């Protein structure tokens, strides 16, 4: 401190002196103001708690000195203590050695001359220091931590303690303490968790902090268990521990002192210690660890199992036993030896012992030794056994048995010796001297029971005598009784006698018996046991056994034993009723006895009921008051001394108690429910028996716990008696009988067929017996019974007549039997009002006058609906009106238009009647044919062909009904006279008339939904008319010139038919045979001969080959060779291509085929049909059945022509008479019609017409109109059911033949939406009807043919029959032979398939069926316009899953079908068949081009759309404009503008610079906008060679950005503009459209596809996106759409359909 003060003083003094000098130098100068600007001063500690650093910035230039002073400040803010001073000329100064955290006052003085000093006073504080000695340790609790620290040097205001959970970084505690606090305890912490503690020292706003980490202690497990798993493994278990991150296990071997440790992760609560020492105690300790903490938990002690000793051997030694073994692994506490046998002994040995001696003398016998090893609480033991024989007990000094042989001859000869031999040994066994005079010889130490020979030899070696004998055998060992299996048997056994023997002998004697011992039994040497039989039960016997060898016996062994007493015999247990008790009886057993032991058990549950000891004389015993219905068992045994015999058993029952509260109820006509209540006691089962009139009907056995049962299949309405019996074993007790009735049977369904005024009620009764009961049908009106009628049980049908039409009543059937009655549910009969009758339509040009008769009944109004028929078979709603009258005028209609009128009556019960529909056409306004039409064209040939042109009589020629050809030989007539139509060929040929009507035929241009021909050529003079005076196209007179005129007959329903004539044609000469060249005639003759020979050879070959199958019997044999050769069957995979090819050029190929078929079969005889008696039976005079195939009815007596009906057998696919085709019945042929049905066993009738159309009756109503049957001849027809649907009606009839007394059911299927001479609206409806027909035919049991009819039985009938046959052919042969099928049909019935439209429609149906594919294929294909939005939504579902699936099919089809337009096999077409024409493709290069290559493709547009030529690649002006001219293009579309960076293309002419090529010259005419605002350029193209000109409209549409599709509205608007351009001009056929794109082929593909799809939608009302995309992709791979573009086609088309097609839906216009 002193140096600082001194330094400060020196600095001050120096400054003072300097200031004085300065002030001296300023004397005489002006005074300056005192003070000056302040300094900018900054104070900091520079990170040091004992320093303060001052820095400043002077406000004035120039060097000044600075004086600084520093003093500490107390808590009240007053300076105190020693002042520190300093002086400097720098801009900063640092004070050292200050107190941390203390406040100081600083003064900074700027020393300026003349004492104008400036002083600044500041207060600052030094930074505090951190605490010292910070510690954080456990406080003895898992949830607490204790923190402690020492004071921080210097001053401070407080300490802040922040405790964080380290893992989650969450704050656990935040507390501030005073500076005097030096410790803190944290509680409620998580055990086993690491925390960080921050201690912050605060001094004002300054702070210093330090931190420390620490863990809380974990919670050790409170339970530990140790379990032995074997000799070397222990398993430890413990419960969970809170906060432990791991567990330390220490297992201590308490014998060896070794430790085994393991560290277990958290979450595991078990561990197995392996490879331990067997038989060793172990102590386990567990420690829970968390961080540095290890907390020991409980301990456990357990032993391992001891290991087993091995090689235990028990050896007999004389009269003692010796045991030895090998010790097992590991440790043990000792051994326990337990010897059992004739003598028992237990001893213990130390753990180190391995042998033991059991000292003798031990009695002989079988001994077993159990050696048990002990280790703690566990042991392990093994056993060994051996036999101890008596020989082992012989004294050691006895060497063996002794042989004593007598019979030695006495001799005094010295030196004699006795030589001993054995039978088993080859040499001498002994050699002893024989004393003189000895008479016996003795050998010792021999084998007992053995045979020996002794030779007596002299001193010279001579044998003087040989003697032999046996040693005495030893007795058998261990004689004992081993079994007493029967009271009269004892089984004894013994051990083999030592040595040798020849056998054993056994004898026995009963104690107390005066008889001698029993029979002696001699046994072989190997027998060691014997069963003594037929002994007296309950008696004691002494048994002796010994061994023998030779004549010697061993000592006998004796044993004393007793037989067991015999059990009592014939024990029985039964129930005695007088008195009521359970009684046991028995007979005395043989043998001895002292008493009887008697026990009685109840078996369920097993309970001892009684136990008695009865005297030996007792033979029965009884028990009273036992539980009823229980099974008991008695056990009886004989007592004799301490012995007890086996038990004799017998069972018996106590009778059960009868059930109570028996109740019988009926819930159904064939059921009875029986219930009862249990009574106390037991039972084994219940038996419930059902009786009907004392006859047992059924029996049911129930379990003892059941309290009810049901009887099924009973007779309804019948009284029954029920008996319930409770059984207990063989005993039973019956309850009182109970009687009950079953409910009467009622119909389970009432089927009501309603007609106006009556109802047929069919009662469906349940199957089975009807039973008894009385039934009534009841009608109620407004809840009151109004009518009742008795019914018979099982009655199936009854009629309700005179019901009020339009009224509602309720009906039920009620039946009663005994006290029970049942009723069906109420059936509400809402009687349908009858239909209107006598409907008459009076047509006019602009209105229809309608009259009818209202039906009787409770009716209200009549609803009249008017619909206009539109082309294609559809209708357009016009209006509807309700009226209560019977006449109505329908105004404001269109002339010559067909309307469908539907009249429906509304009853007051809100029921509508059956609609009566009729088609009525307004009449035409006055038809004004030309006065004289242009003459027809005549074609020359062997005959003459007159060509009739469509429109030759004006645009209203659709009103023409018939055309006629008038021929004349008058060369001066300008036009025919009206009288000419009255003359025929007969008048001309035989009577000399110049002009005559040669031919009359219906209008071939009748409007159809399919395209018709533009001209019709008919041959004249082709028929051989003989003498017929009718209109006949007879041969013309040779050598005459003829002129021809066409006459038209109107279709007006006026009294006088309007006629129109054409001018006569130029004269043409008829060709006579006389002028035909000879070579031509000879060629014709030879050709005819060759054809005849070929046919004869073919027939001969068929005869040799044998008959064909029925299926092919009518295929080709009657067909001209050239037709069969030309028209082959079409394979299924090629059918679509064939169809599209035949559809080209206005169905020209179809027309040619149909023309070829017109004359088929016409020359076949029809004599029976033309007979005068039968003419009136034909509906149309030109539709007559051929004789060879007509159906013949049974001829009626006296009526030779009654077998005729206008019907033919038609061969089906598999049978020659599979189908009958007939006309719709006339009133006069109704009886014949039903005779046909009955005699031919027809079960299915197909009706393809309505009864009336356009006011014309097409077919009589030949079935009952309601439930009232009708009779025709002997056949009565009942209408059983009628089910009308949208497009067909199903009916079922019952036919009853009056004379044959037989019944038969016939089903009728009527297709109601097929107009006469026309086709249905769509193939799908007819195909669905065919499937229904096939199902009904298969379900019909009858084998008769199918009957098909329409009106004439040829047009619609022929189409339907051909479709049936061809569908079978498709299924069986995978081909379709349409032409030959129709050919065969026409050979059997004329005019089968009557119109060209029907012929084409037949092909359409087959194509639709082919494209349907398998039933389980995908649902892509042609989609109806009405269903398109739903189809789009279905495909877009699940992230466009449907689109993705269909697009994959498209890619596969493109890959697989390189040349085929058929979709892949799993591709499915549904709904309406697409009629897109085949694509004709040509290319300028062989492969699909890149952008620099050129390719052109042609897409024909069909009859109503324009042809479309697509040009891709870089086309020059020559290629482009010459292609425009060659393809007669009138509209040119250019997609995409050229790149602005490239040179403008030179394919477009400019105003003053036309384009000139070798073929054409192209001029720009004008530029304008189309009506829709699209830029358009008009060009004039001049052909150089011919000079012809043509105007070409060019629309240029800029494409969108690359990779983006145009907005749907933009593309649709552009297509509309293109369509307007295509259809300009007078031609009905639009001009060709040529589209060109040099680069954007994808967008060109989208443009082309949308153009084709919109045309489909407009013309066909279906769209086929799949096939359109497939065709384009096969035409050019660059136009293959991406998945996004494919989805775009759907979305764009859906937008067009939802918002209306372009041009108000008239899309046939677009190209």
Swiss-Prot record:
InterPro entries named in the record: FN3_dom, FN3_sf, Ig-like_fold, Prot-tyrosine_phosphatase-like, PTP_cat, PTPRJ_TM, RTP_Phos/Ushers, Tyr_Pase_AS
Main location: membrane
Location of the protein in the cell: Membrane
Enzyme class name: hydrolase
Signal peptide stretch: 1-17
Name of this protein: Receptor-type tyrosine-protein phosphatase V
SUPFAM superfamilies: (Phosphotyrosine protein) phosphatases II (SSF52799), Fibronectin type III (SSF49265)
Keywords from the UniProt entry: Glycoprotein, Hydrolase, Membrane, Protein phosphatase, Repeat, Signal, Transmembrane, Transmembrane helix
Domain Fibronectin type-III: 37-129, 130-222, 218-305, 306-391, 393-470, 475-569, 565-654, 655-749, 744-831, 832-926
Active-site residues, record numbering mapped to chain: 1350 (phosphocysteine intermediate)
Species per Swiss-Prot/TrEMBL record: Rattus norvegicus
Cytoplasmic side: 1096-1711
Glycosylation sites: 42, 74, 89, 117, 174, 239, 259, 431, 570, 620, 649, 663, 737, 851, 882, 970, 982
């Amino acid at each position: 401190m002193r140096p600082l003060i001194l330094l400060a003083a020196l600095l001050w003094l120096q400054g003072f002196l300097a200031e004085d000098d300065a002030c001296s130098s300023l004397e005489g100068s002006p005074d300056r103001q005192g003070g000056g600007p302040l300094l900018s001063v900054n104070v900091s500690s520079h990170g040091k708690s004992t320093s303060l650093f001052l820095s400043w910035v002077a406000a004035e230039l120039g060097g000044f000195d600075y004086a600084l002073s520093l003093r500490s400040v107390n808590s009240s803010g007053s300076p105190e203590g020693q002042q520190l001073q300093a002086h400097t000329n720098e801009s900063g100064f640092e004070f050292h050695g200050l107190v941390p955290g203390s406040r100081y006052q600083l003064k900074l003085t700027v020393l300026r001359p003349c004492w104008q000093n400036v002083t600044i006073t500041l207060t600052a504080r030094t930074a505090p220091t951190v605490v010292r000695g910070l510690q954080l340790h456990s406080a003895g609790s898992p949830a607490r931590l204790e923190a402690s620290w020492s004071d921080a040097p210097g001053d401070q205001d407080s300490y802040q303690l922040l405790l964080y959970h380290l893992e989650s970084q969450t704050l656990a505690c935040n507390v501030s303490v005073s500076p005097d606090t030096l410790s803190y305890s944290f509680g409620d912490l998580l055990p086993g968790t690491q925390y960080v503690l921050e201690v912050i020292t605060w001094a004002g706003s300054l702070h210093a902090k330090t931190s420390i980490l620490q863990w809380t202690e974990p919670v050790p497990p409170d339970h530990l268990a140790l379990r032995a798993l074997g000799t070397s493994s222990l398993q430890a278990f413990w419960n969970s521990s809170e906060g432990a991150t791991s567990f330390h296990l220490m297992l201590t071997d308490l014998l060896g002192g070794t430790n085994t440790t393991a560290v277990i992760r958290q979450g595991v609560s078990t561990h197995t210690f392996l490879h331990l020492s067997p038989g060793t105690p172990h102590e386990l300790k567990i420690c829970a660890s968390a961080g540095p903490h290890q907390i020991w938990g409980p301990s456990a002690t357990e032993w391992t199992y001891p290991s087993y000793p091995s090689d235990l051997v028990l050896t007999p030694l004389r009269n003692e036993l010796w045991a030895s073994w090998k010790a097992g692994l590991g440790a043990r506490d000792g051994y326990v030896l337990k010897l059992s046998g004739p003598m028992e002994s237990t001893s213990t040995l130390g753990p180190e012992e391995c042998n033991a001696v059991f000292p003798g003398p031990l009695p002989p016998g079988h001994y077993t030794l159990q050696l048990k090893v002990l280790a703690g609480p566990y042991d392990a033991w093994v056993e060994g056994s051996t036999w101890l024989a008596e020989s082992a007990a012989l004294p050691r000094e006895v060497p063996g048995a002794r042989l004593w042989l007598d019979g030695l001859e006495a001799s005094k000869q010295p030196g004699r010796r006795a030589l001993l031999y054995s039978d088993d040994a080859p040499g001498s066994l002994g050699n002893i001297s024989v004393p003189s005079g000895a008479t016996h010889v003795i050998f010792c130490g021999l084998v007992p029971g053995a045979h020996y020979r002794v030779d007596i030899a002299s001193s010279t070696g001579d044998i003087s005598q040989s003697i032999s004998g046996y040693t005495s055998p030893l007795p058998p060992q261990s004689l004992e009784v081993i079994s007493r299996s029967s009271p009269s048997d004892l089984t004894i056994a013994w051990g083999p006698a030592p040595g040798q023997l020849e056998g054993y002998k056994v004898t026995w004697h009963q104690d107390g018996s005066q008889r001698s011992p029993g029979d002696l039994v001699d046994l072989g040497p190997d027998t060691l046991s014997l069963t003594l039989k037929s002994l007296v039960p309950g008696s004691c016997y002494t048994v002796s056994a010994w061994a023998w060898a030779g004549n010697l016996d061993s000592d006998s062994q004796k044993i004393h034993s007793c037989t067991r007493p015999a059990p009592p015999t014939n024990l029985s247990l039964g129930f005695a009723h007088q008195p009521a008790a359970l009684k046991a009886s028995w007979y005395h057993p043989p043998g001895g006895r002292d008493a009887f032991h008697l026990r009685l058990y109840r078996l369920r549950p097993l309970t001892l009921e009684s136990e008695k000891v009865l005297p030996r004389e007792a033979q029965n015993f009884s028990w009273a008051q036992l539980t009823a219905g229980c099974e008991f068992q008695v056990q009886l045994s004989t007592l004799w001394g301490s012995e007890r015999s086996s038990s004799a058993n017998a069972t018996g029952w106590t009778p059960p108690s009868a059930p109570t509260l028996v109740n019988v109820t009926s819930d159904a006509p064939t059921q009875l429910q029986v219930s009862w209540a249990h009574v106390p006691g037991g039972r084994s089962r219940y038996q419930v028996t059902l009786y009907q009139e004392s006859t047992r009907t059924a029996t049911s056995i129930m379990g003892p716990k059941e309290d009810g049962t049901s009887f099924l299949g009973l007779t309804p309405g019948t009284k029954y008696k029920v008996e319930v019996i409770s059984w207990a074993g063989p005993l039973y007790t019956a309850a009182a009988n109970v009687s009950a009735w079953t409910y009467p049977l009622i119909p389970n369904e009432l089927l009501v067929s309603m007609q106006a005024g009556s109802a047929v009620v069919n009662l469906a009764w349940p199957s089975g017996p009807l039973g008894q009961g009385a039934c009534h049908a009841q009608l109620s009106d407004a809840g009151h019974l109004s009518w009742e009628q008795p019914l018979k049980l099982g009655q199936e049908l009854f009629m309700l007549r005179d019901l009020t039409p339009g009224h509602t009543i309720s009906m039920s059937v009620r039946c009663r039997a005994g006290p029970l009655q049942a009723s069906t549910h109420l059936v509400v009969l809402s009687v349908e009002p009858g239909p209107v009758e006598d409907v008459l339509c009076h047509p006019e040009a602009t209105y229809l006058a309608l009259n009818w008769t209202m039906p009787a009944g409770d009716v209200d109004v009549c609803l009249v609906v008017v619909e206009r028929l539109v082309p294609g078979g559809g209708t357009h709603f016009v209006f509807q009106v309700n009226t209560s009258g019977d006449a109505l005028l329908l105004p404001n209609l269109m002339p010559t238009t067909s309307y469908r009128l539907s009249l429906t009556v509304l009853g007051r019960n809100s029921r509508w009647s059956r609609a009566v529909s009729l088609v009525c056409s307004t009449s035409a306004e006055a038809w004004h044919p030309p006065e004289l039409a242009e003459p027809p064209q005549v074609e020359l040939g062997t005959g003459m062909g007159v060509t009739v042109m469509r429109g030759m009589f004006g645009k209203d020629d659709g009103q023409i009904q018939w055309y006629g050809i008038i021929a004349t030989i008058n060369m001066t007539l300008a036009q025919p006279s009206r009288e000419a139509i009255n003359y025929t060929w007969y008048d001309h040929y035989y009577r000399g008339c110049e002009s005559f009507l040669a031919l009359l035929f219906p209008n071939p241009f009748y409007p159809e939904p399919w395209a018709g021909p533009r001209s019709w050529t008919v041959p004249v003079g082709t028929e051989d008319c003989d003498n017929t005076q009718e209109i006949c196209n007879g041969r013309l007179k040779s050598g005459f010139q003829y002129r021809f005129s066409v006459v038209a007959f109107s279709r007006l329903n006026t009294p006088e038919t309007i006629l129109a004539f054409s001018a006569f044609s130029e004269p043409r000469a008829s060709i006579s045979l006389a002028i035909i060249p000879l070579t031509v005639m000879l060629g014709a003759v030879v050709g005819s001969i060759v054809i005849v020979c070929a046919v004869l050879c073919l027939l001969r070959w068929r005869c040799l080959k044998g008959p064909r199958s029925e299926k092919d019997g009518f295929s080709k044999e009657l067909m001209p060779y050239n037709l069969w050769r030309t028209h082959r069957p079409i394979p299924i995979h090629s059918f679509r291509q064939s169809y599209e090819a035949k559809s080209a050029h206005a169905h020209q190929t179809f027309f040619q085929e149909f023309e070829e078929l017109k004359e088929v079969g016409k020359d076949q005889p029809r004599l029976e049909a033309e007979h005068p008696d039968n003419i009136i039976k034909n509906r149309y005079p030109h539709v007559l059945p051929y004789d060879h195939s007509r159906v013949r009815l049974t001829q009626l007596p006296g009526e030779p022509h009654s077998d005729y009906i206008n019907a033919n057998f038609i061969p089906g696919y598999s049978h020659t008479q599979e189908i009958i085709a007939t006309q719709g019945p006339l009133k006069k042929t109704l009886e014949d019609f039903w005779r046909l049905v009955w005699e031919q066993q027809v079960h299915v009738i197909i009706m393809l017409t309505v009864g009336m159309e356009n006011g014309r009756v097409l077919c009589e109503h030949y079935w009952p109109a309601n439930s009232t049957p009708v009779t025709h001849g002997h056949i009565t027809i009942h209408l059983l059911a009628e089910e009308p649907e949208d497009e067909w009606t199903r009916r079922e009839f019952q036919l009853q033949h009056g004379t044959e007394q037989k019944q038969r059911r016939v089903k009728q299927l009527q297709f109601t939406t097929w107009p006469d001479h026309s086709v249905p609206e769509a193939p799908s409806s007819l195909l669905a009807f065919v499937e229904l027909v096939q199902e009904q035919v298969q379900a019909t049991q009858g084998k008769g043919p199918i009957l098909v009819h329409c009106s004439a039985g040829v047009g619609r009938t022929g189409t339907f029959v051909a479709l049936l046959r061809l569908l079978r052919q498709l299924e069986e042969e995978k081909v379709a032979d349409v032409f030959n099928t129709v050919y065969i049909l026409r050979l059997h019935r004329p005019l089968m398939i009557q119109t060209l439209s029907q012929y084409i429609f037949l092909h359409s149906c087959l194509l639709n069926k082919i494209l349907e594919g398998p039933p389980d294929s995908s649902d892509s294909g042609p989609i109806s316009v009405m269903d398109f939005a739903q189809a789009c939504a279905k495909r877009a579902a699940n992230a466009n899953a449907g689109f993705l699936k269909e697009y994959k099919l498209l890619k596969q089809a493109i890959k697989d079908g390189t040349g085929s337009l058929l979709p892949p096999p799993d591709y499915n077409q549904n709904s309406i068949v697409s009629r897109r024409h085949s694509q004709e493709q040509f290319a300028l290069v062989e492969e699909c081009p890149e952008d620099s290559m050129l390719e052109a493709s042609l897409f024909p547009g069909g009859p109503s759309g324009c042809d479309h030529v697509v040009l891709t690649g870089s086309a020059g002006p020559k290629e482009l404009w010459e292609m425009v001219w060659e393809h007669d293009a009138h509209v040119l579309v250019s997609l995409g503008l050229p790149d602005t960076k490239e040179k403008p293309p030179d394919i477009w002419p400019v105003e003053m610079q036309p384009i000139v090529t070798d073929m054409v010259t192209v001029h720009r005419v004008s530029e304008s906008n189309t009506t829709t605002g699209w830029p358009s350029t008009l060009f004039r193209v001049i052909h150089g060679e011919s000079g012809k000109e043509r105007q070409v409209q060019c629309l240029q549409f800029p494409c969108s950005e690359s990779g983006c599709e145009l907005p749907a509205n933009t593309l649709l608007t552009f297509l509309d503009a293109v369509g307007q351009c295509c259809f300009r001009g007078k031609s009905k056929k639009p001009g060709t459209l040529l589209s060109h794109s040099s680069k954007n082929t994808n967008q060109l593909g989208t443009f082309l596809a949308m153009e084709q799809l919109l045309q489909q939608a407009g013309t066909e009302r279906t769209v086929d996106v799949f096939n359109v995309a497939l065709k384009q992709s096969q035409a050019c791979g660059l136009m293959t759409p991406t998945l996004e573009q494919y989805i775009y086609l759907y979305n764009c088309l859906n937008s067009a359909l939802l918002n209306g097609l372009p041009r108000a839906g008239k899309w046939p216009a677009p190209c």
